[in-house]
C-alpha cells in the first residue's frame, strides 16, 4: 500500500518489513496472508473446521461468542504467538526460472494455518506427555500443507528434552509417500 501523502510504501504493510501476517476476520471465518499485493493478494483459510469435518467454523450456541474467537482467545495469546514466531514462521526462498531462462528468487513467508498449528501442538504435547514408543498419524486433506505440518512436527519433536536435559528422542522417523 502506498501512502497517499508521501507516495512511499507503508512500512507496516510491506513484505518482510512490516507485519508478518494479516488476518481478515468476520464473525464466522478467518483468512490470512503474509503478503499484501492489492487485488492480487491471496488469502488462505485460518479456520478450525466444523464438528462435522467441514470447512469453516462451528457457530457457537452462545450469542455472546463468535465463531472466530479462537483467534484472540487461543492463537494470539502471548505464549502461543511467541511459539509461532520461534517454531513455525519461515521464509522460503525458491530459485525459479522465467520463460526466457533468467533465474530469480521467489520469497514466500510461511505462516501456519490453524489446522497445522493445532495438530503440531497436539502432537508435541502428546509426545512430551507419553514419551517415546508411540505412533501418530497426521491426516490433512489435499493442498492443506501436509509437508509443512510434517516438517514442523519433526523439527519440534527432535528438539524436545527431558527435565534432566537429555533429548527425548534419539531420532524422528517420518514415513511418507511424498517426494520432497
Functional labels for PLM-detected ranges:
Residues 1-176, 180:
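ATP-dependent helicase/translocase motor core
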Amino acid at each position: 500500500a502506498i501512502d497517499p501523502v508521501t507516495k512511499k510504501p507503508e512500512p507496516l504493510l510491506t513484505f518482510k518489513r512490516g507485519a508478518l501476517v494479516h488476518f481478515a476476520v468476520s464473525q464466522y471465518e478467518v483468512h490470512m496472508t503474509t503478503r499484501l499485493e492489492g487485488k492480487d493478494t491471496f488469502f488462505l483459510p485460518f479456520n478450525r473446521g466444523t464438528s462435522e469435518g467441514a470447512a469453516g467454523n462451528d457457530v457457537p450456541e452462545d450469542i455472546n461468542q463468535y465463531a472466530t474467537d479462537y483467534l484472540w482467545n487461543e492463537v494470539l495469546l502471548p505464549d502461543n504467538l511467541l511459539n509461532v514466531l520461534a517454531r513455525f514462521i519461515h521464509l522460503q526462498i525458491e530459485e525459479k526460472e522465467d520463460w526466457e531462462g533468467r533465474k530469480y528468487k521467489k520469497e514466500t513467508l510461511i505462516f501456519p494455518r490453524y489446522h497445522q498449528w493445532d495438530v503440531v501442538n497436539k502432537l508435541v504435547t502428546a509426545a512430551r506427555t507419553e514419551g517415546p514408543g508411540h505412533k501418530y498419524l497426521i491426516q490433512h486433506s489435499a493442498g492443506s500443507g501436509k509437508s509443512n505440518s510434517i516438517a514442523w512436527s519433526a523439527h519440534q519433536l527432535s528438539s524436545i528434552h527431558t527435565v534432566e536435559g537429555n533429548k527425548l528422542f534419539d531420532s524422528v522417523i517420518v514415513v511418507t509417500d511424498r517426494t520432497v
